[in-house]
Regions:
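Conserved glycine-rich FAD pyrophosphate-binding loop
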Residues: 1-111
Length: 111
């Protein structure tokens, strides 16, 4: 299957730049198959970025799509700090419970 990949650089810094990537590919007859294909592309691209020492979030935050890579980017200490902040500011755990961080400190994983 042919995939067109477009990219542009944005937000240039001394130590790097933001690369925005768009994938174009034929949609499958079943929308679920199209979504699955896109998720696989995104997963492979995200893994490649993290393995190369890049970040996958930039100024837009993390969100559920990037949550599986949060610990790889922030490290165990970063996750511990985020959990401590959440527990301090939201001791009852009522703000988006179980979405990005859990009480065990691991990041969200899709079911």
């Amino acid at each position: 299957q042919r995939i067109l990949i477009f990219a542009h650089l944005s937000h240039m810094y001394q130590d790097g730049a933001s690369i925005y990537v768009t994938f174009l590919f034929p949609r499958a007859p079943d929308p679920e198959d199209t979504l699955l294909f896109w998720r696989r592309l995104k997963e492979r691209a995200s893994q490649t970025i993290v393995e190369a020492g890049g970040t996958i979030s930039h100024q837009h935050g993390v969100g559920l799509d990037h949550a599986p890579y949060l610990e790889a980017e922030k490290g165990h200490l970063g996750i511990d700090v985020l959990n401590a902040v959440c527990k301090t500011l939201d001791p009852k755990g009522i703000l988006n419970p179980g979405k990005l961080l859990t009480t065990t400190g691991s990041t969200y994983q899709e079911p």
